[in-house]
Regions:
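Membrane-embedded alpha-helical bundles of multi-pass transporters/translocases
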Residues: 2-224
Length: 224
Protein backbone atom coordinates (compact mmCIF):
# COMPACT_ATOMS: atom_id res chain seq x y z
CA UNK A 1 0.00 0.00 0.00
CA UNK A 2 1.34 3.46 -0.89
CA UNK A 3 1.22 6.19 1.70
CA UNK A 4 -1.12 9.08 0.94
CA UNK A 5 0.59 12.32 0.04
CA UNK A 6 0.60 15.01 2.71
CA UNK A 7 -1.90 17.80 2.04
CA UNK A 8 -0.52 20.87 0.31
CA UNK A 9 -1.13 23.66 2.82
CA UNK A 10 -1.17 27.43 2.38
CA UNK A 11 2.24 27.60 4.06
CA UNK A 12 3.53 25.04 1.58
CA UNK A 13 2.10 27.15 -1.22
CA UNK A 14 3.79 30.31 0.01
CA UNK A 15 7.13 28.60 0.44
CA UNK A 16 6.99 27.23 -3.07
CA UNK A 17 5.29 30.14 -4.81
CA UNK A 18 7.22 33.06 -3.28
CA UNK A 19 9.99 32.79 -5.87
CA UNK A 20 7.40 33.57 -8.52
CA UNK A 21 7.33 37.19 -7.33
CA UNK A 22 10.92 38.16 -8.24
CA UNK A 23 10.78 36.05 -11.40
CA UNK A 24 7.74 38.00 -12.58
CA UNK A 25 9.35 41.25 -11.39
CA UNK A 26 12.31 40.90 -13.77
CA UNK A 27 10.62 40.99 -17.16
CA UNK A 28 8.64 44.23 -17.11
CA UNK A 29 11.55 46.59 -16.30
CA UNK A 30 13.68 44.97 -19.01
CA UNK A 31 11.07 45.50 -21.71
CA UNK A 32 9.52 48.77 -20.54
CA UNK A 33 12.00 50.67 -18.37
CA UNK A 34 15.34 49.59 -19.84
CA UNK A 35 14.77 50.93 -23.40
CA UNK A 36 13.73 54.32 -22.06
CA UNK A 37 16.67 54.37 -19.68
CA UNK A 38 19.23 53.72 -22.43
CA UNK A 39 17.53 56.13 -24.82
CA UNK A 40 17.39 58.98 -22.29
CA UNK A 41 20.63 58.42 -20.39
CA UNK A 42 22.88 57.19 -23.21
CA UNK A 43 21.20 58.36 -26.41
CA UNK A 44 20.79 54.88 -27.90
CA UNK A 45 18.10 54.65 -30.57
CA UNK A 46 15.05 52.55 -29.84
CA UNK A 47 15.62 50.59 -33.06
CA UNK A 48 19.08 49.57 -31.89
CA UNK A 49 17.77 48.69 -28.45
CA UNK A 50 15.02 46.60 -29.99
CA UNK A 51 17.50 44.70 -32.13
CA UNK A 52 19.72 43.91 -29.14
CA UNK A 53 16.73 42.84 -27.04
CA UNK A 54 15.39 40.62 -29.82
CA UNK A 55 18.75 39.02 -30.57
CA UNK A 56 19.59 38.21 -26.97
CA UNK A 57 16.10 36.92 -26.27
CA UNK A 58 16.24 34.69 -29.36
CA UNK A 59 19.54 33.24 -28.17
CA UNK A 60 18.01 32.52 -24.78
CA UNK A 61 14.98 30.87 -26.39
CA UNK A 62 17.25 28.63 -28.48
CA UNK A 63 19.01 27.46 -25.33
CA UNK A 64 15.83 26.78 -23.34
CA UNK A 65 15.55 23.09 -24.39
CA UNK A 66 19.12 22.47 -23.22
CA UNK A 67 18.31 24.20 -19.94
CA UNK A 68 15.32 21.92 -19.52
CA UNK A 69 17.38 18.78 -20.10
CA UNK A 70 19.99 20.02 -17.64
CA UNK A 71 17.26 20.63 -15.06
CA UNK A 72 16.03 17.05 -15.49
CA UNK A 73 19.55 15.81 -14.86
CA UNK A 74 19.86 17.99 -11.76
CA UNK A 75 16.64 16.70 -10.22
CA UNK A 76 17.63 13.13 -11.10
CA UNK A 77 20.81 13.70 -9.12
CA UNK A 78 19.15 15.35 -6.11
CA UNK A 79 16.82 18.17 -5.19
CA UNK A 80 19.70 19.77 -3.31
CA UNK A 81 21.70 19.97 -6.55
CA UNK A 82 18.79 21.71 -8.28
CA UNK A 83 18.44 24.11 -5.36
CA UNK A 84 22.14 24.96 -5.46
CA UNK A 85 21.95 25.80 -9.15
CA UNK A 86 18.82 27.86 -8.51
CA UNK A 87 20.64 29.87 -5.85
CA UNK A 88 23.57 30.53 -8.19
CA UNK A 89 21.18 31.55 -10.98
CA UNK A 90 19.41 33.94 -8.60
CA UNK A 91 22.72 35.67 -7.88
CA UNK A 92 23.34 36.17 -11.60
CA UNK A 93 19.80 37.45 -12.16
CA UNK A 94 20.33 40.11 -9.51
CA UNK A 95 23.82 41.03 -10.74
CA UNK A 96 22.81 41.13 -14.40
CA UNK A 97 19.71 43.22 -13.71
CA UNK A 98 21.68 45.73 -11.63
CA UNK A 99 24.53 45.93 -14.15
CA UNK A 100 22.12 46.70 -16.99
CA UNK A 101 20.97 49.89 -15.27
CA UNK A 102 24.48 50.97 -14.21
CA UNK A 103 26.48 50.82 -17.42
CA UNK A 104 29.93 52.45 -17.02
CA UNK A 105 30.59 52.60 -20.78
CA UNK A 106 29.48 54.61 -23.78
CA UNK A 107 29.40 54.20 -27.54
CA UNK A 108 29.92 50.80 -29.10
CA UNK A 109 31.19 49.42 -25.80
CA UNK A 110 27.86 50.35 -24.24
CA UNK A 111 26.02 48.07 -26.66
CA UNK A 112 28.43 45.27 -25.78
CA UNK A 113 27.69 45.86 -22.09
CA UNK A 114 23.97 45.82 -22.83
CA UNK A 115 24.14 42.59 -24.83
CA UNK A 116 26.32 40.85 -22.25
CA UNK A 117 24.09 41.99 -19.40
CA UNK A 118 20.96 40.80 -21.18
CA UNK A 119 22.48 37.41 -22.00
CA UNK A 120 23.55 36.86 -18.39
CA UNK A 121 20.20 38.01 -17.03
CA UNK A 122 18.07 36.08 -19.52
CA UNK A 123 20.02 32.83 -19.15
CA UNK A 124 20.07 32.99 -15.36
CA UNK A 125 16.37 33.88 -15.38
CA UNK A 126 15.60 30.89 -17.62
CA UNK A 127 17.57 28.50 -15.42
CA UNK A 128 15.83 29.75 -12.29
CA UNK A 129 12.39 29.67 -13.92
CA UNK A 130 12.80 26.14 -15.29
CA UNK A 131 14.05 24.80 -11.95
CA UNK A 132 11.21 26.53 -10.10
CA UNK A 133 8.51 25.23 -12.42
CA UNK A 134 10.00 21.73 -12.52
CA UNK A 135 10.06 21.72 -8.71
CA UNK A 136 6.32 22.38 -8.66
CA UNK A 137 5.58 19.82 -11.37
CA UNK A 138 7.44 17.14 -9.43
CA UNK A 139 5.27 17.65 -6.35
CA UNK A 140 2.61 15.63 -8.13
CA UNK A 141 -0.70 15.04 -6.39
CA UNK A 142 -4.19 15.03 -7.82
CA UNK A 143 -5.61 17.69 -10.13
CA UNK A 144 -6.76 19.81 -7.19
CA UNK A 145 -3.32 19.85 -5.60
CA UNK A 146 -1.58 20.60 -8.89
CA UNK A 147 -3.96 23.51 -9.38
CA UNK A 148 -3.07 24.88 -5.93
CA UNK A 149 0.63 24.58 -6.67
CA UNK A 150 0.27 26.56 -9.90
CA UNK A 151 -2.12 29.06 -8.29
CA UNK A 152 0.38 29.94 -5.57
CA UNK A 153 3.19 30.36 -8.08
CA UNK A 154 1.15 32.48 -10.47
CA UNK A 155 -0.49 34.43 -7.66
CA UNK A 156 2.90 35.46 -6.31
CA UNK A 157 3.90 36.25 -9.87
CA UNK A 158 0.95 38.61 -10.18
CA UNK A 159 2.21 40.58 -7.19
CA UNK A 160 5.61 40.68 -8.88
CA UNK A 161 4.12 42.19 -12.03
CA UNK A 162 2.25 44.81 -10.00
CA UNK A 163 5.40 45.70 -8.07
CA UNK A 164 7.42 45.92 -11.29
CA UNK A 165 4.89 48.31 -12.79
CA UNK A 166 5.20 50.73 -9.86
CA UNK A 167 8.59 50.55 -8.15
CA UNK A 168 10.99 51.41 -11.03
CA UNK A 169 8.88 54.37 -12.16
CA UNK A 170 8.04 55.74 -8.73
CA UNK A 171 11.20 54.96 -6.77
CA UNK A 172 13.88 54.46 -9.43
CA UNK A 173 15.98 51.62 -10.74
CA UNK A 174 18.16 51.43 -7.62
CA UNK A 175 15.09 50.66 -5.54
CA UNK A 176 13.97 48.13 -8.14
CA UNK A 177 17.35 46.40 -8.02
CA UNK A 178 17.21 46.27 -4.22
CA UNK A 179 13.68 44.85 -4.24
CA UNK A 180 14.64 42.23 -6.82
CA UNK A 181 17.72 41.12 -4.87
CA UNK A 182 15.90 40.94 -1.54
CA UNK A 183 12.91 39.04 -2.92
CA UNK A 184 15.23 36.59 -4.69
CA UNK A 185 16.96 35.88 -1.38
CA UNK A 186 13.62 35.35 0.35
CA UNK A 187 12.23 33.31 -2.53
CA UNK A 188 15.17 30.92 -2.76
CA UNK A 189 15.29 30.64 1.03
CA UNK A 190 11.63 29.67 1.18
CA UNK A 191 12.03 27.27 -1.73
CA UNK A 192 14.72 25.48 0.25
CA UNK A 193 12.09 24.83 2.95
CA UNK A 194 9.23 23.96 0.61
CA UNK A 195 7.90 20.42 0.02
CA UNK A 196 10.07 18.19 -2.12
CA UNK A 197 9.08 15.34 -4.35
CA UNK A 198 10.11 11.82 -3.53
CA UNK A 199 12.82 10.25 -5.68
CA UNK A 200 11.31 9.22 -8.98
CA UNK A 201 12.33 6.49 -11.38
CA UNK A 202 12.24 7.72 -14.93
CA UNK A 203 12.54 5.85 -18.17
CA UNK A 204 14.53 6.93 -21.21
CA UNK A 205 13.64 10.43 -22.42
CA UNK A 206 10.91 10.69 -25.03
CA UNK A 207 11.71 11.96 -28.49
CA UNK A 208 11.84 15.75 -28.65
CA UNK A 209 9.22 15.87 -31.43
CA UNK A 210 6.62 13.89 -29.48
CA UNK A 211 4.59 16.98 -28.37
CA UNK A 212 4.03 17.92 -32.02
CA UNK A 213 1.84 14.84 -32.40
CA UNK A 214 -0.66 16.36 -29.98
CA UNK A 215 -3.34 18.49 -31.67
CA UNK A 216 -3.99 20.59 -28.51
CA UNK A 217 -0.26 21.37 -28.29
CA UNK A 218 -0.16 22.51 -31.91
CA UNK A 219 -3.26 24.64 -31.33
CA UNK A 220 -1.61 26.25 -28.31
CA UNK A 221 1.48 27.15 -30.32
CA UNK A 222 -0.73 28.78 -32.95
CA UNK A 223 -1.56 31.45 -30.37
CA UNK A 224 2.06 32.52 -30.35
Amino acid sequence: MTRAAAPFTAWDGLRYGALGLPLAFVALPLYVVLPGHYAEQHGVSLATLGAVLLGTRALDAALDPAIGRAADALFARSTRAALTVAAIAAVFVALGFTALFHAPLEGAALLGWLAAGLIVTYLAFSVLTVVHQAWGARLGGDASQRSRVVAWREGCGLFGVLAASVIPLQFGVDAASAVLASTLVVGVGLLAQSPRSAAQRTGPPAHWALPWRSAPFRALLAVF
